[in-house]
């Protein structure tokens, strides 16, 4: 709580002369003399110069330049100012305010008014279930051309009005879906293009169009979006640098000038702090150190943020980082959305206390929405805005809110948090329990009734009167509002973004090294395949040289693919920071362009250096460098193209298919697959739009106009010119520089497109809401009918399935990890306790105490580190394989398959995890009961969706996570923060359900951060931990928490708990690190010395002994269901995941249609007229195009899909839901019908357009070959995901894989010419078998004579001599083509079962 009065003012003087020793006159004189040296400096120098504490060597205070503070100096200064956050932060702010007031300077303030504010969103009305299936999407696309879609509007905010005042803290409360987030976004000026906004929002009487609201205020989102490679400090430093200092420097100059005039000597430490935080553009800012301290992030300041696949900070720390990222800036108007998610109540209280101090002392304007504020936290607020159904019910002082509802007959119970009461009073199901007039009948009071009553009340009338008066602009400083978009100058913004980009490249250096290593491997293979093919200058070897040049270009084209996924992975953070005006798009784009140039140049140089002389190109050194120049420029254009595609399309699916289409178009029109002279005249323009064409022109001109190709063949035509004529690439000797200029133009064009897309392209929005016609047509009145009392067995837990009660005991558990510096860090220290059947245990502690770590160790989820100690289940050592069968784990982060419904998620869990002898009817009844218990039955048909994009809200996902585990009927349930992200009412519902589960005799343990009094006293036992993973208390809380209160109040010096204080908040507060230091108590050691510890140890030892007649936990099989049932269940889920993922499948269908159509047009009827070898090679090129490019696209699409589902797979595999083989083969089988559809479409389009021979036999061979090819590419993509830790590595591996398949397909260089030491790679390459099947089946039996390199030959003989294809070998080809998918699919299943890249 905030301290006031003289006592605090006396404490406030303790730091004033800390740089001097003693309190005598000499010290005062020394201070004056040292300050005089600062005062003599020019104004600019004076505001960046301060006095720091005396150093130990000279014994004197030091004059320092605050722009050059080292890390140690910054930490020393912050430690001196804010040693204990609870007291020192208030003291610091008061000193700053006192200094400002002393010279008579007024701080800028902002008042935010909103009047009749309305927000509406468009919603699509459909018939049937509102589920986006493949068929629904196709129907929707067709209906757009036939008739308009039926749409309606949903009101999110409905004419709300109010005032958020400076100097006051306002709390925003309301149930989920009431419009809190929308209100916060609207007030901060974040209007989405997809919504319609009415009414007005004003800051200090100015409308949002008159200034820059995004810079004046800060909206802190409930989504934690950060760059995982950066550390916490680096994230805050970058944010502080980009947000600038606002008006701090002007205020500092004014203060300095006035103090000099009035001869005032400020507190040196405060002066140093104010000056250091007023300097713009610093790489490392003192404000960062201050925010790290205030938010408790100093302990993880140098830890990388991390993500789902990379270790990093905890969820609570990420939430605080999101807050700190914006609070570190100069804005004092803060709109904060659910900032306490994942935080313990003590940490939340501390943070909100600091914000309250900022509001009261610095006159900041702060509006915060919280889900479950503890009573102590609730008391910190001055005003409350209570919302319901998109309307404001109450907007007035906090102190009057209980009295307002008492007028309606509703009273908050004595041991009930007011915030919890306010959230539940809106609920039709919970309102009656607060009715206090037992002598009068209760009837449901609607939201509108509350609103009307408030408007008629004195509070409502007062608010209306204030809103009717115009704001007096003359009362505030103009610099309270921001009129500049960007805080930094252009050069400073570019420097900041460049520093960050360079750092990220260093952090991702392994990806770049891996990419270069694969390039070296491809180059080594290529140069040995084409070994000295250029030694002979004839048409045949010239053709091989063309193939080697195409191979180089194709490899460097694919080399740009990883840039696409890397760019997309950063777009989320970029969009957030661009919207906040951290920097313009060009400042972000230029460093990412320029710093990648050396990588492209290096890769191209490596390729040229390794291959040029070994393959046998023209030996002149000049031509070596000219080839390198073209290759590096081409590679740059490709990287730039993929970067631009990512910036334009923004999503991984849309960008991937566009990238694949780009590769297809570039290759088809590039002049190698089909010569320009063979293209239809009306499509010839495509050749000039492809960078690959210019690269081909430049490379071939460089080679075939060289002296060794200058031998005249006939009619003054040289050998080189003849080769170029055959390929349609003869554009003269000077075409090299034309091609080079064109490639430079492409580089500039694509990079300009990238910058423009980042600048003007709208950010990805949440998917449009879909509502069923039935729900839309339902009368509105039905929503306001009071709910009947629920008497179903769902609320009483009547369905009890058989299970074995189990006790988990753990003694002296320790856990160690190795830090990046190679040191060992202990996270758990000698934890002893027991989890008992029928007992609901809470695991509590401040953020970072090790709660989740202990839960992970006990449940067996840790994949790294060293675990010591003894863990037993039922008196026997824990065996993870069997333990996983009887335990459930609710993760902190809600990981679910996005394309199945809520009810299907539960059915899937019950199907695979309940014993096989439980019939389907019972399972379905249990699913229904659990849905009702956690109140998900109303949305059971809703698709889960992707977090932040579509589907369920955060709190609905949390309830789904719990429901999925409850329906599995485990004996032991571990729950990691089951109430995080839920409002007070939803948390109460969930914990009521959990309590019911525990009362059936199951063992349940939950980590919990912000329990209300009701929830805290629901638990039967408490395990309390402190920082360092040490045990502080283990035992029952007692009636009304009496036992835990009695234990801690027995320590002398501890403050007694106040009346109506939440015991959970109190014990977390008194056992914090700062409280221990203040009291001089080590609660961990005190617990070990206590009688309670000895009693607990005896109990644990008794429970650790197996009872007579018992036996260790074992099952007849590893999984609950048979392998066949597992496969069926997984296939059922995969079916819905694919069917309801139209973007995944429509893009693949669209690509095959486009590829087939382009091939049909470019090779129109060419299969009927074969007269020479080039005609046949061109037809072979069409087959190559139909095999390689759709396969590449399918491979890319499946990589995205499998990578997205892998975290779900890890969760389900840990729960022993199924064998990895069952999951893998279900994934394999579901691809079959979709690949068959693609093959049919391709065959139907291509066969008649290209003019292949119309026979059932040959058509079947084409269909069969393409079908097997697609399966091979699909399963290869799955295998790449199984082999790599993240999608970036998988895409990099894909690029190398494509290059190898392209090289050994038999098209670029035929089988007969491949050196014997590489021929095994030809037979290993699936594309070679597919192409052999296609070409041999079509022409292997054709005896027509054609002209081959000047002589006549039968087609079948040419195929055998040139390509090595025999019609008689088709039986072998057929066998290999079906064997390949089976082998690759088996490898995928094997590696999915053996490899895990999840780090815990």
Swiss-Prot record:
Pfam families: ABC2_membrane, ABC2_membrane_7, ABC_tran, PDR_assoc
Subcellular location(s) per record: Cell membrane
UniProt topology in membrane: Multi-pass membrane protein
Gene Ontology cellular component list: plasma membrane
Domain of life: Eukaryota
Domain ABC transmembrane type-2, first and last residues per copy: 492-704, 1125-1339
GO molecular function, one term: ATP hydrolysis activity
Gene3D superfamilies per the UniProt record, alphabetical: P-loop containing nucleotide triphosphate hydrolases
Binding site residues for ATP 1: 174-181
Keyword terms, alphabetized: Abscisic acid signaling pathway, ATP-binding, Cell membrane, Glycoprotein, Membrane, Nucleotide-binding, Repeat, Transmembrane, Transmembrane helix, Transport
Mutant lacking the gene: phenotype: Early seeds germination on imbibition without stratification, and reduced abscisic acid (ABA)-mediated inhibition of stratified seeds germination. Altered root exudation of phytochemicals, with increased phenolics (e.g. benzoic acid, salicylic acid, syringic acid, tartaric acid, lactic acid, alpha-linolenic acid, cyanidin, sinapoyl malate, valine and indole 3-acetic acid) and decreased sugars levels (e.g.
Protein name: ABC transporter G family member 30
Organism: Arabidopsis thaliana (Mouse-ear cress)
């Amino acid at each position: 709580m905030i301290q006031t009065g003289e006592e605090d003012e006396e404490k406030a003087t303790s730091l004033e002369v800390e740089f001097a020793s003693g309190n005598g006159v000499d010290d005062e004189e020394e201070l004056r003399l040292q300050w005089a040296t600062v005062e003599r400096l020019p104004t600019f120098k004076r505001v960046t110069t301060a006095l720091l504490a005396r150093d130990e060597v000279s014994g004197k205070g030091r004059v320092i330049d605050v722009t050059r503070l080292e890390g140690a100096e910054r930490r020393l200064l912050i430690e001196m100012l804010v040693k204990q956050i609870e007291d020192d932060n208030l003291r610091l702010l008061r000193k700053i305010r006192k200094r400002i007031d002393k010279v008579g300077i007024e701080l800028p303030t902002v008042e935010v008014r909103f009047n009749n504010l309305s927000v509406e969103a468009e919603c699509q009305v459909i018939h049937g279930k509102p589920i986006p299936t493949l068929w629904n999407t196709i129907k929707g696309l067709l209906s757009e051309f036939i008739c308009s879609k039926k749409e309606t509007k949903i009101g999110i905010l409905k004419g709300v009005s109010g005032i958020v005042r400076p100097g006051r803290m306002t709390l925003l409360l309301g149930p989920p879906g009431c419009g809190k987030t929308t209100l916060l976004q609207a007030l901060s000026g974040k209007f989405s293009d997809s919504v319609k906004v009415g009414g007005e929002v004003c800051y200090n009487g100015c409308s949002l169009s008159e200034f820059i609201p995004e810079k004046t205020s800060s909206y802190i989102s409930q989504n934690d979006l950060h760059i995982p490679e950066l550390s916490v400090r680096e994230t805050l430093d970058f944010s502080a640098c980009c947000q600038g200092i606002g008006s701090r420097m002007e205020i500092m100059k004014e203060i300095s000038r006035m103090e000099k005039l009035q001869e005032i000597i400020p507190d040196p430490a405060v002066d140093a702090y104010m000056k250091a935080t007023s300097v713009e553009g610093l790489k490392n800012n003192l404000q960062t150190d201050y925010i790290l301290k205030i938010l408790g992030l100093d302990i993880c300041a140098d830890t990388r943020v991390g993500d789902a696949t990379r270790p990093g900070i905890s969820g609570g720390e990420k939430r605080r980082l999101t807050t700190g990222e914006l609070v570190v800036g100069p804005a004092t108007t803060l709109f904060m959305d659910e900032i306490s998610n994942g935080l313990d109540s003590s940490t939340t209280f501390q943070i909100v206390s600091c914000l309250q101090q900022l509001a009261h002392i610095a006159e900041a304007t702060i509006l915060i929405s919280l889900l479950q504020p503890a009573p102590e936290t609730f008391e910190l607020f001055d005003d409350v805005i209570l919302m319901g159904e998109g309307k404001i019910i109450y907007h007035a002082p906090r102190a009057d809110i209980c009295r307002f509802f008492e007028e309606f007959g509703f009273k908050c119970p004595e041991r009930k948090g007011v915030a919890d009461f306010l959230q539940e009073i809106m609920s039709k199901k919970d309102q009656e329990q607060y009715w206090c007039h037992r002598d009068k009948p209760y009837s449901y009071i609607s939201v509108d009734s509350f609103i009307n009553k408030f408007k008629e009340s004195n509070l409502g009338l007062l608010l209306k009167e204030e809103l009717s008066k115009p704001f007096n602009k003359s009362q505030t400083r103009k610099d309270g509002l921001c009129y500049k978009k960007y805080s930094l100058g252009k050069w400073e913004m570019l420097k900041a973004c460049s520093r960050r980009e360079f750092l990220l490249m260093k952090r991702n250096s392994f990806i770049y090294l891996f990419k270069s290593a694969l390039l070296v491997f491809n180059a080594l293979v290529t140069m040995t395949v084409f070994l000295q093919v250029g030694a002979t200058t004839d048409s045949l070897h010239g053709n091989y040289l063309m193939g080697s040049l195409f191979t180089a270009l194709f490899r460097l084209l694919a080399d740009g693919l990883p840039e696409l996924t890397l760019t997309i992975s950063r777009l989320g953070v970029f969009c957030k920071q661009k919207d906040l005006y951290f920097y313009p798009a060009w400042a972000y784009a230029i460093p990412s362009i320029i710093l990648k140039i050396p990588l492209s140049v290096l890769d191209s140089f490596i390729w040229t250096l390794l291959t040029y002389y070994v393959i046998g190109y023209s030996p002149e050194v000049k031509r070596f460098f000219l080839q390198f120049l073209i290759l590096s420029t081409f590679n740059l254009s490709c990287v730039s193209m993929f970067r631009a595609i990512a910036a334009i399309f923004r999503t991984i699916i849309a960008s991937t298919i566009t990238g694949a289409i780009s590769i297809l178009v570039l290759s088809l029109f590039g002049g190698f697959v089909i010569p320009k002279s063979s293209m239809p005249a009306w499509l010839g323009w495509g050749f000039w739009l492809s960078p690959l064409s210019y690269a081909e022109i430049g490379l071939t001109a460089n080679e075939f106009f060289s002296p060794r190709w200058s031998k005249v063949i006939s009619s003054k035509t040289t050998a080189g010119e003849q080769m170029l004529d055959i390929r349609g690439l003869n554009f003269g000797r000077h075409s090299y520089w034309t091609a080079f200029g064109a490639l430079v133009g492409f580089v500039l064009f694509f990079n300009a497109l990238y910058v423009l897309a980042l600048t003007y392209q709208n950010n990805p929005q949440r998917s449009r809401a879909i509502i069923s016609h039935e729900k839309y047509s339902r009368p509105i009145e039905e929503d306001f009918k009071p709910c009947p009392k629920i008497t179903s067995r769902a609320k009483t837990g009547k369905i009890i399935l058989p299970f074995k009660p189990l006790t988990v005991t753990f003694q002296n558990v320790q856990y160690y990890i190795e830090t990046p510096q190679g040191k060992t860090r202990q996270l758990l220290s000698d934890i002893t306790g027991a989890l008992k059947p029928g007992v609901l245990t809470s695991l509590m502690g401040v953020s970072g105490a090790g709660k989740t770590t202990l839960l992970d160790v006990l449940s067996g989820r840790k994949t790294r580190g060293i675990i010591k100690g003894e863990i037993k289940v039922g008196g026997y050592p824990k065996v993870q394989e069997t333990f996983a069968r009887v335990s459930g784990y609710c993760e902190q982060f809600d990981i679910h398959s996005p394309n199945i419904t809520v009810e299907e998620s539960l059915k899937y869990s019950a199907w695979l995890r309940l014993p096989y002898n439980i019939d389907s009817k019972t399972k379905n009844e249990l699913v229904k009961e659990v849905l009702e218990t956690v109140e998900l039955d109303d949305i059971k048909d809703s698709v889960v969706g992707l977090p932040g994009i579509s589907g369920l809200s955060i709190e609905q996902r949390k309830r789904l996570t719990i429901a999925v585990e409850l329906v599995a009927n485990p004996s032991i349930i571990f729950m990691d923060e089951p109430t995080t992200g839920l409002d007070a009412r939803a948390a109460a519902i969930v914990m009521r359900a959990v309590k019911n589960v525990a009362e059936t005799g199951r063992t349940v343990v939950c980590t919990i951060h912000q329990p209300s009094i009701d929830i805290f006293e629901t638990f039967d036992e408490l395990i309390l931990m402190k920082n360092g993973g040490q045990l502080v208390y283990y035992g029952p809380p007692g009636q009304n928490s009496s036992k835990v209160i009695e234990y801690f109040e027995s320590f002398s010096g501890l403050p007694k708990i106040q009346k109506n204080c939440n015991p959970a908040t109190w014990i977390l507060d008194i056992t914090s690190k700062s409280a221990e230091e203040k009291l001089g108590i080590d609660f961990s050691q005190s617990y070990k010395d206590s009688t309670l510890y000895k009693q607990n140890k005896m109990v644990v030892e008794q429970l650790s002994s197996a009872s007579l007649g018992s036996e260790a936990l074992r099952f007849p099989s590893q999984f609950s269901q048979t392998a066949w049932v597992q496969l069926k269940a997984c296939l059922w889920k995969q079916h819905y995941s694919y069917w309801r993922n139209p973007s995944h499948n429509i893009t693949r269908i669209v690509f095959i249609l486009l590829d087939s159509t382009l091939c049909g047009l470019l090779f129109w009827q060419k299969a009927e007229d074969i007269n020479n070898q080039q005609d046949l090679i061109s037809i072979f090129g069409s087959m190559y195009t139909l095999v390689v490019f759709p396969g590449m696209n399918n491979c890319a699409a499946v990589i995205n899909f499998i990578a997205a589902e892998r975290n779900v797979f890890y969760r389900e595999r840990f729960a022993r839901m199924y064998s990895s083989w069952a999951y893998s083969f279900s994934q394999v089988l579901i691809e079959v019908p979709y690949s068959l559809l693609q093959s049919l479409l391709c065959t139907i389009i291509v066969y008649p357009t290209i003019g292949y021979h119309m026979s059932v036999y040959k058509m079947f061979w084409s269909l069969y070959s393409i079908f097997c090819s697609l399966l091979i590419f699909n399963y290869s993509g799955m295998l790449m995901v199984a082999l790599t830790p993240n999608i970036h590595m998988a895409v990099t591996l894909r690029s190398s894989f494509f290059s190898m398949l392209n090289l050994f397909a038999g098209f670029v260089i035929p089988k007969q010419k491949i050196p014997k030491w590489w021929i095994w790679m030809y037979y290993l390459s699936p594309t070679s078998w597919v192409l052999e099947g296609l070409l041999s089946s079509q022409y292997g039996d054709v005896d027509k004579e054609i002209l081959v390199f000047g002589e006549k030959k039968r087609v079948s003989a040419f195929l055998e001599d040139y390509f090595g294809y025999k019609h008689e070998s088709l039986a072998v080809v057929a066998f290999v083509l079906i064997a390949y998918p089976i082998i690759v699919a088996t490898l995928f299943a094997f590696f999915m079962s053996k490899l895990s890249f999840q780090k815990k």
